[in-house]
């Protein structure tokens, strides 16, 4: 039995090596970007949800640079962030250009910290992304809090203990945008607004549409009437009103989550909406508020987490990323170069929403400024 397992492992390693050398040949020595590395990640039992998100984040350059900079700081106690920094550093400092790395330390820490991921079942990539970004932000804020209490900040100042609002971290600098919820009373025309921060936007999907259309739908005007009337402070009573959500501040990296999993009452479970949703290589949002800080911001698609299968707890996740001027597909330990036109294969299906499909699930757009 042990001999068979050894032979199996050797065969797997040989296959990985063949894939790696084929990738190098396909890119070519002259075209291969300087100081860039393309490494697949070993799957530790349904950890493709994690691998795909990590690959997408690695190719969000501002995020990668901050994680690598964190690695160079004085050694901190082990956390999910130190494990991520070790993994990114390991990829970035490899002698080889292509290959495979086991993210074992990161996966072990993830399973230790959150029981949701402490099993060998398929998990939701969006839930993992959300957990990872919020956990990193919490770690950074706690470290800054400790520095304040010790009276030593990076700028050498001693900060006030009275400031109860956590400082924004580089996670917020990269991913955080602001929505403004505008409500207009239909009686007195008074407009009230409330701001809400986000690290990613979840948008509803429809058949044969585009991400631009989905984002417009995100800002559709909703009428509040009947039992859902709005309490107007000016009128001092409940009134009919119009409510809509607009983007007040666009983030450096816009993470868009397509809500492809819907609970079906008749099935008593979630099923996948494999709708065809076109996502362009370039994007500009038109649902910004009148006082938006950067309404004309242009974005380029840099990564997509793709769900393959028919449901949230079944199937597989892969990532497609843009590196310099070409696209790569990361499928756990396999890395392949693909044509830009091949991205159209991940838009979804034009019919039979419950059929297995490879469809874009999380989109990462990076701003040009």
Curated annotation (Swiss-Prot):
Zn(2+) binds at residues 185, 188, 232, 235. It holds the Pfam family UCH. GO terms for cellular component: cytoplasm; cytosol; nucleus; plasma membrane. It is an enzyme of class 3 (hydrolase). InterPro entries: Papain-like_cys_pep_sf (IPR038765), Peptidase_C19 (IPR050164), Peptidase_C19_UCH (IPR001394), USP_CS (IPR018200), USP_dom (IPR028889). GO terms for biological process: protein deubiquitination; proteolysis; regulation of protein stability. The keyword Cell inner membrane does not apply. GO terms for molecular function: cysteine-type deubiquitinase activity; cysteine-type endopeptidase activity; metal ion binding. It catalyses: Thiol-dependent hydrolysis of ester, thioester, amide, peptide and isopeptide bonds formed by the C-terminal Gly of ubiquitin (a 76-residue protein attached to proteins as an intracellular targeting signal). It is found in: Nucleus; Cytoplasm; Cell membrane. Residues 145-165 are annotated as: Disordered. Activated by interaction with WDR20, WDR48 and DMWD through different allosteric mechanisms. A motif (Required for plasma membrane localization of USP12/WDR20) lies at residues 1-4. Coiled coil: none annotated. Its EC number is 3.4.19.12. Belongs to the peptidase C19 family. USP12/USP46 subfamily. Interacts with WDR48. Interacts with WDR20; this interaction promotes translocation of the USP12 complex to the plasma membrane. Component of the USP12/WDR20/WDR48 deubiquitinating complex. Component of the USP12/WDR20/WDR48 deubiquitinating complex. Interacts with PHLPP1. Interacts with RBPJ. Interacts with CBP; this interaction blocks the acetyltransferase activity of CREBBP. This is Ubiquitin carboxyl-terminal hydrolase 12. The gene is USP12.
């Amino acid at each position: 039995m042990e001999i068979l397992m050894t032979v199996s492992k050797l065969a797997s390693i040989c296959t990985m090596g063949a894939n790696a050398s084929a990738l190098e040949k396909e890119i070519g020595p002259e075209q291969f970007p300087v100081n860039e590395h393309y490494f697949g990640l070993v799957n530790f039992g349904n950890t493709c949800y994690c691998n795909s998100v990590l690959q997408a984040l690695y190719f969000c350059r501002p995020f990668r640079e901050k994680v690598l900079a964190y690695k160079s700081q004085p050694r901190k106690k082990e956390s999910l962030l130190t494990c991520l920094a070790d993994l990114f550093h390991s990829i970035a400092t490899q002698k080889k250009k292509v290959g495979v790395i086991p993210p074992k330390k990161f996966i072990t820490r993830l399973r230790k910290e959150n029981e949701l991921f402490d099993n060998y079942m398929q998990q939701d990539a969006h839930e993992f992304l959300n957990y990872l970004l919020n956990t990193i932000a919490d770690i950074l804020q706690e470290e800054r809090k400790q520095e304040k209490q010790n009276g030593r900040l990076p700028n050498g100042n001693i900060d006030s203990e009275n400031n109860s609002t956590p400082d924004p971290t580089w996670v917020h600098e990269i991913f955080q945008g602001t929505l403004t919820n505008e409500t207009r009373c239909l009686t007195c025309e008074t407009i009230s607004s409330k701001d809400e921060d986000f690290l990613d936007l979840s948008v509803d999907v429809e058949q044969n549409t585009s991400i631009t259309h989905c984002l417009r739908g995100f800002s559709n005007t909703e009428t509040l009437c009947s039992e859902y009337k709005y309490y107007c402070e000016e009128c001092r009573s409940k009134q009919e009103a119009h409510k809509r959500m607009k983007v007040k501040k666009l983030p450096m990296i816009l993470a868009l989550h397509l809500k492809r999993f819907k609970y079906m009452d008749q099935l008593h479970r979630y099923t996948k909406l494999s709708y065809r949703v076109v996502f362009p290589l370039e994007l500009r949002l038109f649902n910004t508020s009148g006082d938006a800080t950067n309404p004309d911001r242009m974005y380029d698609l840099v990564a997509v987490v793709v769900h393959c299968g028919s449901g949230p707890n079944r199937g597989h996740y892969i990532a497609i990323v843009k590196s310099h001027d070409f696209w790569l597909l990361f499928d756990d330990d396999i890395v392949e170069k693909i044509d830009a036109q091949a991205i159209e294969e991940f838009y979804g299906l034009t019919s039979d929403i419950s059929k297995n499909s490879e469809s874009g699930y999380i989109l990462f757009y990076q701003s040009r400024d």
